[in-house]
UniProtKB/Swiss-Prot annotation:
The lineage of its organism: Bacteria, Bacillati, Bacillota, Bacilli, Bacillales. HAMAP family: COD. Probably catalyzes the deacetylation of acetylated carbohydrates an important step in the degradation of oligosaccharides. This is Carbohydrate deacetylase. The gene is celC. Belongs to the YdjC deacetylase family.
């Protein structure tokens, strides 16, 4: 039986360096999909790249722990009007603020002339018990698949069979990537999360995960990787194709 894999690059829109790294991993590597941070400074730049490359599947990367909100959501921000990076505001956040902000991010995504292929989130905040009900409602309204949820209550939203968040950190290699691919069972669809990028000033000043992104990019664009996946009978797809399986 065929096996399918979506290789999704998170943080599209974080900075131009991130955007160009993701594009490189798509054009010359195994990345098939990306998720866009609608509240970040390079979101519009990412959207232009996406429209220029329609084969790249682009979903929405909901953000509640990075940058500034698009809506007036006082229970979600700190004294500087920014989302706290560790997500501590989510515990006491008002449901209405979460709804307003996620709707605002989705509306901005649509304003770019794009339709999201799926939903995931920065730092996996869609798994938070105060956030998931809102995400579930939006996913049902727009009929969008979501990245698998490991901690929220059971749901009926479409999602892949296997999610690999562990192509992340120091010392990543092609063998590490292949070891994940080898865990996809017959007839299953998997998603591998990744964060390729080129380092630029916004990334270096805003993220502690920088050099590792360049290392990820090198692995994801290894010229032998596509062939090795094909030899294993793994087909690269996006969430668009997944929804039709």
């Amino acid at each position: 039986m065929p096996r399918y894999c979506i290789v999704n690059a998170d943080d599209f829109g974080y900075s131009k360096g991130v955007n160009y790294g993701i594009l490189e991993a798509f054009q010359n590597g195994v990345v098939t999909s990306a998720t866009l941070m609608a509240n970040m400074p390079a979101a519009e730049h990412a959207a232009r790249l996406a429209k220029d490359h329609p084969e790249l599947g682009v979903g929405i990367h909901f953000v509640l722990t990075c940058g500034r909100p698009l809506a007036d959501v006082p229970s979600l921000v700190n004294e500087n009007g920014e989302f706290p990076r560790r997500g501590e505001a989510l515990v006491g956040a008002r449901r209405g603020d979460i709804e307003r902000e996620l709707c605002a991010q989705l509306e901005r995504f649509f304003s770019f002339g794009l339709t999201p292929t799926h939903i995931d989130s920065h730092h996996h905040v869609h798994e938070h018990p105060n956030v998931f009900p809102v995400v579930e409602q939006l996913a049902e309204r727009y009929r969008l698949p979501i990245r698998p949820v490991r901690t929220a209550r059971p749901h009926r939203l479409p999602t892949v069979d296997v999610f690999f968040p562990d192509f992340y950190g120091d010392g990543l290699t092609k063998d590490r990537f292949i070891s994940l691919i080898d865990r996809i069972g017959d007839g299953q669809t998997a998603e591998v999360m990744c964060h390729p990028a080129y380092i630029d000033v916004p990334l270096a000043s805003g993220s502690s995960y920088c050099q590792q992104r360049v290392e990820e990019l090198a692995v994801l664009t290894d010229p032998t990787l596509v062939a090795e996946m094909a030899e294993r009978g793994v087909q690269l797809i996006t969430y668009r194709e997944f929804y039709k399986l």
